[in-house]
């Protein structure tokens, strides 16, 4: 960015945890970029929520919303001409209760003010290939059918290949 080596028609993407100091540094690092996607994530799976973070569903949802609101605030206040897009991942989506994943993503869509004209990319990872391809596809189908703000979202599948089923998971998820 500093040396102006990124062509104007190229979009760069950055990944940030839903943590205030990291979000602030991430947005700051984009100064001078023409087009950028800020990809926010936080873990939402039952196991990580209960064992690693020792937080409730509501606390995890609030973490995602607070991160999204901060990104929205910082990019609205941004001193530059960067064209920002946003992406959100409920990390370990396939280990998250389906209705909880839907609710979190709807809340993030609202916090970012995403619309049919300015869609949020919603990345749905099958982290460490936690479930079989058919189960992952069922989760994608449930998610897409139940997302309240479906018109304001681009669904991005993110299969892993830890057990060698990544291609099958991707193909079935696309069919969902």
PLM segments and residue spans:
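A glycine-rich helix N-cap at a beta->alpha junction
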Residues: 8-16
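A general secondary-structure junction signal
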Residues: 16, 126, 159-161
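Short acidic loop-to-helix transition motifs that present clustered carboxylates
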Residues: 17-22, 162-166
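Thiamine diphosphate
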Residues: 158-176
């Amino acid at each position: 960015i500093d040396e102006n080596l990124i062509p104007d028609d190229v979009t760069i993407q950055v990944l940030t945890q839903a943590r205030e100091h990291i979000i602030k540094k991430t947005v700051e690092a984009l100064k001078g970029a023409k087009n950028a996607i800020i990809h926010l994530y936080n873990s939402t799976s039952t196991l990580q929520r209960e064992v690693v973070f020792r937080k409730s569903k509501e606390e995890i949802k609030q973490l995602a919303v607070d991160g999204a609101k901060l990104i929205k605030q910082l990019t609205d206040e941004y001193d530059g001409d960067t064209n920002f897009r946003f992406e959100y991942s409920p990390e370990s989506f396939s280990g998250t209760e389906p209705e909880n994943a839907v609710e979190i993503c709807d809340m993030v869509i609202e916090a970012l003010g995403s619309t049919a004209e300015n869609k949020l990319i919603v990345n749905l990872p099958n982290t460490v290939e936690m479930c079989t391809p058919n189960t992952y596809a069922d989760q994608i189908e449930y998610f897409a059918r139940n997302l309240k703000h479906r018109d304001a979202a681009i669904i991005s599948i993110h299969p892993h290949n830890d057990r060698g089923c990544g291609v099958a998971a991707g193909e079935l998820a696309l069919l969902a």
